[in-house]
Each structure stands twice: as structure tokens, then as C-alpha cells.
Amino acid sequence: MNSFKWGKKIILFCLIVSLMGGIGVSCSFNKIKDSVKQKIDSMGDKGTYGVSASHPLAVEEGMKVLKNGGSAVDAAIVVSYVLGVVELHASGIGGGGGMLIISKDKETFIDYRETTPYFTGNQKPHIGVPGFVAGMEYIHDNYGSLPMGELLQPAINYAEKGFKVDDSLTMRLDLAKPRIYSDKLSIFYPNGEPIETGETLIQTDLARTLKKIQKEGAKGFYEGGVARAISKTAKISLEDIKGYKVEVRKPVKGNYMGYDVYTAPPPFSGVTLLQMLKLAEKKEVYKDVDHTATYMSKMEEISRIAYQDRKKNLGDPNYVNMDPNKMVSDKYISTMKNENGDALSEAEHESTTHFVIIDRDGTVVSSTNTLSNFFGTGKYTAGFFLNNQLQNFGSEGFNSYEPGKRSRTFMAPTVLKKDGETIGIGSPGGNRIPQILTPILDKYTHGKGSLQDIINEYRFTFEKNTAYTEIQLSSEVKNELSRKGLNVKKKVSPAFFGGVQALIKDERDNVITGAGDGRRNGTWKSNK
């Protein structure tokens, strides 16, 4: 299979750098493992730690927390808030997300997705009650160790003092201008045009809101002036905003290629990802990895099967009776194996962000946050954009609109463990997330190469009866896919194909390596 390289940056701690032609660079797993023997920082040899995220400033701030003795959870709160400032188009306090936490003594998933309001009158809103701030507070109060005010400070600094805009944000503002531009967004569109790459973006209103949260906790967001601003802009009642609740769920757990897999429970799509992985294993899809058309068509087949099962059986567990662990059992997968599945049709915006953190104690955080679409609805209040998550509901079935409900999402933060190896991985990409992650893990677990090299390879995804590819396929491959019932279209948008972030800890060598996706400015660092 052909591969392409992106690249612009040189990442610290890499002796040999993998160059990729886009934005962002990460180190090759094999090269760093074999060649880089660095001394641990001033904390001594008490363990290794690392951060993988879609913006270098978020990685830097997360590493500072870990270096100073903070936990993976502490660093995750910092990274989440910083991404909401410096990658504000993909996530933020006006949205929500989910966080998978796997440690030696706990396995938990925190769901802080946006919810539908109860009090809407005759209208059906597009904006859900934001869950991000409540989620961060719950995670801190139950799993964090450092003071919350301290964890908020880096994000406040970047909002108040500013940061250098990268070309990803400039491009996103340019593409979104017809949809979101207004005079209220002059800090993003000085003189009516997107702020240029390299310019400093200062977000005074956001800094003010973050300081209010720092001082008053989540109450400063869900009550008072910020809540009134949300209510006025989003047409959501103050009762709905104040009444937001975080959900704590058990991760879905299964086995794949000898790995124990922990992944996000419904209404997230860890079930779908794990089903696809297990179907790929049972159908021995990897045998055809070097035959492009066959490999693609088999991946499309298992996508159809798993997505159909998702559509029929998954939804908000507060509204739908289901057993997600049963749905990833070997017995259940065997019943799915011979199904055909419907054409892939359920849509979801690709505009999310993912990060992974591993601390000295081996605790892994794999988290995906979102506004749904880039910049959400485009509606802006109190310094942040409001989500458009409610557009992800369907008209009928388990994903139909109901008050207080969370819509289904394709997000699937995941952790895999086997023989002293721990992998934290995930991606943005909307309805393509399981399709993006499955071939990557299929190739990695079969030893095709380093995780970074596999992430660098060109991708393909499917929707309805069309295969979307990053490169132009040969006429021979396209003709073969056509005979299998698939049209082929080249898609020029890198963000369309996700932004996989990952870390791998090898406990035998006490080394952390990682992978970052140049499609979305991805990078990573470790102390060893």
C-alpha cells in the first residue's frame, strides 16, 4: 500500500525524525525505541510519562503538569482547557466530550456530552446544554490531585495574553466564514478577514469567563451571568443549564488480538470500533493488506455490518435498554460475521479533538472533546462558541430526539493492554472514526510497522456506496472496487480523514513512544 509523508516540525526527544509534509511531526516508534536513550528530567527515574494532542501548546502544558508531579487526570484537565483556547474551532467550554481513565485500580468513563433541554416550548433547538465545564469539575473532584485553579491557569494565560495563530486555525476561520462571520467575531476576523498565521490572538472575554470558573467553580458557568448569556443566545432555559448532570459509566471491555480493550460505552461508539476490530480478526482481513482493492472492500463490508448494528441497537443508556459488553462478545460477533449490512449513511461532523496522556504510575487518559461542527453553531457568547450537537439526533429509533437525552456519537476513545504494552488511541472524524481507527490498529497489531508510520499512510473511508481516498488510486484498483460495487472519490481535505493521536508505553523497557497526526497539527512528547 502506498504511503505519504507530511511534515514541518522537529519534535523534541527524537534522534531521527519522521518528516511529513503538512503540519506536525511525530517520532517513529521503532526509531525512538532503538535509538533514543534519554535521561529522565529532574524527577529522576521514577517513571515515564507523555502527552499526545493536536496542538503543541497543549502538549507542552500537559508535560509541565506531569513533570511537576501531577497525574494524567490533572494533565488531562489542563490539556482540555488549553485546547479549548488554542484549538477553539474543535472543542471548548461551549461543548462536551468523554474521558476514558484506565489505571491499576480503576476503569471508568466520564460522559460530559451535551444534552437536550427539557424546557423548549414549541421549538426544537440545535444547541445542547454544554457539559464540558461540569465534566472537568467532576473529573477533578473525583480523580484529580492538584488545585483546580492551578489547572485552569495555563488556559487563562493563553486567552488573556494570547498565542501565535497557526495555519490550521486561519484555514478553519476562512472555510467557516460564510457560515459564522459576524461583527461579534472581530477578534477572529480583523478587517473582515481571518486572523493571519503568526499573528497573536487575544480572547479577553474567554479569559474573563475562565477566571469566573476558576473563582466560582462550575457554578460560575451554569449559574449567573454566563448562564444568562448562554440562555439568551442558545434559547435554552436557565433551569436546563443549571440542571446539567455528568454521567459516569463503565467502559466497554473486550478482547482483540490478545489485547484487553477498554473503550467508550454508549452513546459513544466504542462498541462499534471493537466490533469492527473483532470482525477484522475473525474474517482475517489483514491477509489482504497488500491487495488494496480487496483490503478496502473487506473493510467496507465490516463497516456496514457494525454500523448497521449500531443504528439498530445503540443509544443513550438512560433511554435505551442494552448490554454493550454482550455486543462485543465472541458469540455476538459470530452472529454478525455473516451479515451484509446496509449502505453506510449516518452522518456526523468530523470537527472534534482527541488526546492521550500517560503518567508515571501508568494511568492512561484517552479523551475526545467536541463542539460537533467546527465552531459549533457559530454562535458566540461570553468568549466561546456554542455547540450544534443536537443535529446528531435522528428522526426515529433509539437516536430520536427526547428531552434530557444525549445523541449517539461516533467518538471512541480507547485503551489497549497486552503483555506490558499499553496503547492509548483515538481520533476526531465524525462518522468515520471507527473506520479510521480499525485499519490502523489492524496493521499495528499484525506488526506492519510503527504506529506513527501506519498513521502516516494514506487513508480511505466509506459512505453509502462510495470509497473516499486521500490519494488517486490506479485505474486497476478503481475498476476492481467498481466491480465490488464501490465508487471511488478522492477527497482533498486532510481533516476529513481524522487526526489520530496515540501513546504507547512499553513497561518492559520503561519507554513511552507516541504518534501524532499531521492532518491536524498533531504532535507528542515524552520524558523518556
From Swiss-Prot:
Inducing stimuli: Capsule synthesis is transcriptionally regulated by AtxA, AcpA and AcpB.
Protein residues bound to poly-gamma-D-glutamate: T352, G429, G430, N431, R432, R520
Residues making up the signal peptide according to the UniProt record: 1-26
GO biological process assignments: capsule polysaccharide biosynthetic process; proteolysis
Entry keyword set: Capsule biogenesis/degradation, Hydrolase, Plasmid, Protease, Signal, Transferase, Virulence, Zymogen
PTM description: Cleaved by autocatalysis into a large and a small subunit.
Designated name of the protein: Capsule biosynthesis protein CapD proenzyme
Species of provenance: Bacillus anthracis
Taxonomy of the source species: Bacteria, Bacillati, Bacillota, Bacilli, Bacillales
